[in-house]
Amino acid sequence: MMKYRRKKKPKVCKLCQSKIDYVDYKDVKLLREFLTEKEKIIPRRVTGNCAKHQRMVKIAIKRARQMALLPYVKY
């Protein structure tokens, strides 16, 4: 029996849709959307971010962690 693959809908970058040019490390509410329950960064293929915004999110999360706005890990 062959299993049929379901066509996946292409994901759209949330940040491009809302026309955000810069991701600020102080915007903790936005950054938490891109973290798992254990505070790990969610990959681009899951979130649907474009490469440019994924890099900005990654850098902003790392800066926020250094400034103690976000935790490194949660157990």
Swiss-Prot record:
GO terms for cellular component: cytosolic small ribosomal subunit. It comes from Thermosipho melanesiensis (strain DSM 12029 / CIP 104789 / BI429). Part of the 30S ribosomal subunit. Forms a tight heterodimer with protein bS6. GO terms for molecular function: small ribosomal subunit rRNA binding; structural constituent of ribosome. Gene3D superfamilies: Ribosomal protein S18. Belongs to the bacterial ribosomal protein bS18 family. Keywords: Ribonucleoprotein, Ribosomal protein, RNA-binding, rRNA-binding. Binds as a heterodimer with protein bS6 to the central domain of the 16S rRNA, where it helps stabilize the platform of the 30S subunit. Pfam families: Ribosomal_S18 (PF01084). This is Small ribosomal subunit protein bS18. GO terms for biological process: translation. NCBIfam families: S18.
